[in-house]
């Protein structure tokens, strides 16, 4: 039903950004869609009506890899969910260490730079704030996060992915949901 208005519903985007299994949650009204990248062929494609995975593209060097991952984010935003966005990205975990920390930072830096270039503002949400918003505990583990997600959304990802454990991409999908939800709730409560 259209009232002739060209205004589009604001889409709340939650991005759990990583090198191996990034995930995006798109909230539009009461509709949820989830996207993720994976290295596992069995998780490539549509897992359900609102959950879709895609295999990582081949890459030649780290910068090429980071560019491909950010290309995927823009594919989800522009090709699958064009519109008015409020974007939230999970912040860095202070537990990250070693050489991998630099690649994580470079990877996310490229995404943030590209979002800025396209005049798409974003906010970061601290991991402990996400966990506390989901479970009431800032140090919640993956299983606690999953149980909160299942209770809240009624989406049984273990059943959909035919697995007993909360690994990738399940934990990434859960995190992307709470990045969007907690980020949005915190940003609206800070405006009052």
Task: Give short role names for the model-derived ranges.
Residues 1-192:
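Phosphate- and other anionic-substrate recognition elements at nucleic-acid/protein interfaces
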């Amino acid at each position: 039903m259209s009232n002739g208005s060209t205004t589009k519903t604001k889409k709340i985007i939650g991005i759990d950004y990583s090198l191996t299994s990034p995930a995006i949650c798109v909230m539009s009204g009461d509709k949820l869609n989830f996207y993720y990248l994976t290295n596992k062929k069995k998780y490539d494609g549509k897992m359900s009506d609102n959950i879709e995975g895609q295999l990582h593209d081949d890459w030649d060097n780290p910068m090429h890899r980071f560019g491909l991952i950010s290309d995927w984010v823009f594919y989800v935003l522009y090709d699958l969910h064009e519109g008015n966005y409020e974007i939230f990205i999970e912040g860095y975990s202070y537990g990250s260490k070693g050489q991998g920390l630099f690649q994580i930072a470079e990877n996310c830096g490229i995404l943030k730079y590209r979002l800025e270039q396209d005049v798409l503002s974003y906010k970061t949400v601290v991991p402990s704030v996400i966990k506390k918003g989901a479970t009431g505990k800032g140090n919640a583990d993956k299983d606690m996060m999953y149980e909160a997600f299942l209770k809240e959304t009624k989406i049984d990802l273990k059943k959909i992915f035919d697995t007993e454990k909360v690994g990738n991409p399940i934990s990434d999908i859960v995190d992307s949901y709470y990045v969007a939800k907690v980020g949005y709730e915190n940003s609206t409560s800070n405006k009052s």
